[in-house]
């Protein structure tokens, strides 16, 4: 075989190791084949779909280990695919990642998808890159709402699923019932007969085995899963391999060395570095023309520069400055854009403002509206589920997304980068239909809870204008409650639910549709304690205020007038002085100088604070602190604007 044909595979003669080929052909022998033995590698593209915490990323780690992507002596971090700090801390996958393994002479490109509906914008894009999907389901929990969200998208684009029942060793496993639930789910999502005839595997991603029988054998590792992928998933459906180059951008990232890097599957033709390309928008308009500086292919968890890529392979290209997600990257001779997957609209919005508190600029180094604007628009470039709008005054920005989790992750990321900003309470995106009726987003909510706590859950959900559609036992003295509830009623309910159920409830949400406005929902029952002066909080003053309600600050913490320092025990706001020191006298008496014992404060996490604040309050976020404050810091301004709001109502 001539060398040029060898390079089409992405291989170069010196890089081929005998260990890899020995592994692929099953001999384990350490030999390097002659050039004539190397064939153009076949390709399979698959996505792994699963709910949060059902073991998707762990399974990918095991696939990488067992297919020889790591050396035997290489130390490998757990959950290799979750490379983002926030992903590791929260235990969720936020960004879609691509990797590849080689099995029996076939390159299997695997895409790890986010399982959370807030990050569904990623999911829809990557489904257009793959030809099959592994639906990973927990043997105890069964298919969950987010599984339904992604599976529905996958079935709609015609993917043929493989169902893998994971965590089969769980003592509360019920794999037979779960298989029936999966079948019912597929049927309810209008799956075709071919899609309903899905193969099933059982196993444990953590222990590194899968088999067609729940009891094993376990000594074959994940080989049955990889073999099934080769049999069941079709080869990439590509256009003309010798035709003009065309590719849809599905993932976007900014690289400090390469600039914009676009990942996608090549639809037709081939591409080489330094080749001229143009970028078409969805309506066929030319966005830019340029040259490809580098082509990167996924090999294991590494990205390797290659000399040529062909139709069907998933690659990343660099060298263009304007092309983005859902655009068509193509040869200059192409005139029509490829059709891209539509993306669901955002449902929640919030305001990002320049931090104008008296403590602004003391803890972060990125505080101006210009750097905040640049950072938000840069985020929106790579995250199509986000929408950014500027206010008229240019000092605040309206950021819309899929849910408060997605926005909280963005705020936490910016905070770690050194930004200081103020953010408002999340608000729901409403719109009017053709008759002028106000419509609001409704979500399907599934809550698994112990039977003894089901009453309080139903009561709290009905207060939030939710309608219960289903109540059924889910095994182990637990019940599954299904509601349709307005999105605005669910903001902040997660922490309250955990308190009501002593941490035993699991809540999952999924966007359902838009329905007519359900009416007002009562908000927070308590008022707040506001500092009336600026300085450092004093333990003596805080001790004397404990009867007024719990504090959310500690002694010695810097405060300013208008900052929230505690939760009032009544429903009105109260201004207090937390700076008042003990009166010093020269008269001594027994027991006067005892140490002050304070009740520990309630610490507000970012997620909790976002949902706790009201419409007239802001959360001040800095790299070191999270502070809560009133929108108007001056007491007279608050009274004046409060009266104006009442008059408008």
PLM regions: where:
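Structural and coupling elements of P-loop NTPases
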Residues: 11, 17, 24-25, 30-649
């Amino acid at each position: 075989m001539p060398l040029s044909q060898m390079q089409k595979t992405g291989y170069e003669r010196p890089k081929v190791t005998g260990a890899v080929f020995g592994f692929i052909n099953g001999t384990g022998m350490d030999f390097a084949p002659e050039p004539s033995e190397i064939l153009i590698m076949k390709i399979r593209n698959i996505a792994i779909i699963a709910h949060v915490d059902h073991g998707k990323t762990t399974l990918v780690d095991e696939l990488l280990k067992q297919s020889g992507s790591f050396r035997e002596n290489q130390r490998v971090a757990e959950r290799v695919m979750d490379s983002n700090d926030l992903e590791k801390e929260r235990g969720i996958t936020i960004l879609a990642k691509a990797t590849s393994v080689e099995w029996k002479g076939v390159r299997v490109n695997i895409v790890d998808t986010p399982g959370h509906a807030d990050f569904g914008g990623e999911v829809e894009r990557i489904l257009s890159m793959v030809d099959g999907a592994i639906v990973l389901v927990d043997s105890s929990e069964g298919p969950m709402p987010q599984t339904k969200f992604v599976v529905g998208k996958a079935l709609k684009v015609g993917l043929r699923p493989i169902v893998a029942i994971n965590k089969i060793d769980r003592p509360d496993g019920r794999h037979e019932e779960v298989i029936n639930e999966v079948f019912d789910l597929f049927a309810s999502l209008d799956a075709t007969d071919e899609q309903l005839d899905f193969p099933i595997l059982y196993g444990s991603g953590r222990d590194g085995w899968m088999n067609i029988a729940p009891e094993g054998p376990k000594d074959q590792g994940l080989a049955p899963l990889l073999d099934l992928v080769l049999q069941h998933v079709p080869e990439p459906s590509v256009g003309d391999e010798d035709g003009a180059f065309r590719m849809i951008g599905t993932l976007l990232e900014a690289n400090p060395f390469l600039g914009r890097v676009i990942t996608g599957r090549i639809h037709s033709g081939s591409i080489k570095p330094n080749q001229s390309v143009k970028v078409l928008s969805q309506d066929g308009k030319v966005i830019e023309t340029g040259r490809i500086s580098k082509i990167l292919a996924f090999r294991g968890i590494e990205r390797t520069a290659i000399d040529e890529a062909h139709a069907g392979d998933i690659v990343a290209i660099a060298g263009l400055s304007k092309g983005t997600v859902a655009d068509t990257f193509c040869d200059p001779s192409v005139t029509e854009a490829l059709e891209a997957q539509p993306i669901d609209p955002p449902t929640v919005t919030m305001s990002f403002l320049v931090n104008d508190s008296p403590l602004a600029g003391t803890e972060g180094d990125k505080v101006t509206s210009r750097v905040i604007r640049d950072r938000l628009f840069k985020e929106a470039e790579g995250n199509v589920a986000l929408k950014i709008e500027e206010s008229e005054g240019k000092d605040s920005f309206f950021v819309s997304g899929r849910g408060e989790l997605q926005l909280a992750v963005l705020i936490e990321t910016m905070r770690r980068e050194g930004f200081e900003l103020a953010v408002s309470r999340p608000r729901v995106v409403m719109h009017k239909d053709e008759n002028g009726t106000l419509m609001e987003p409704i979500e399907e909510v599934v809550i698994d809870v112990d039977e003894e706590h089901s009453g309080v859950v139903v009561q709290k959900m009905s207060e939030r204008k939710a309608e219960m559609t289903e109540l059924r036992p889910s095994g182990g003295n637990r019940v599954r409650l299904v509601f349709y509830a307005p999105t605005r009623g669910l903001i902040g309910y997660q922490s309250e639910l955990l308190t009501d159920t002593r941490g035993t409830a699991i809540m999952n949400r999924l966007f359902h549709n838009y329905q007519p406005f359900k009416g007002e929902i009562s908000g927070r029952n308590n008022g707040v304690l506001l500092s009336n002066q600026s300085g450092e909080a004093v333990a003596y003053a805080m001790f004397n205020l404990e009867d007024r309600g719990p504090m959310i600050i500690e002694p010695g913490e810097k405060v300013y007038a208008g900052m929230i320092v505690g939760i009032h025990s009544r429903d009105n706001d109260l201004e207090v002085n937390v700076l008042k020191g003990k009166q010093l006298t020269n008269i001594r008496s027994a027991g006067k100088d005892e140490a002050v014992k304070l009740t520990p404060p309630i610490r507000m996490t970012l997620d909790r604070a976002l949902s706790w604040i009201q419409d007239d309050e802001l959360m001040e976020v800095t790299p070191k602190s999270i502070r809560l404050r009133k929108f108007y810091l001056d007491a007279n301004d608050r009274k004046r604007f409060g009266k104006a709001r009442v008059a408008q109502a």
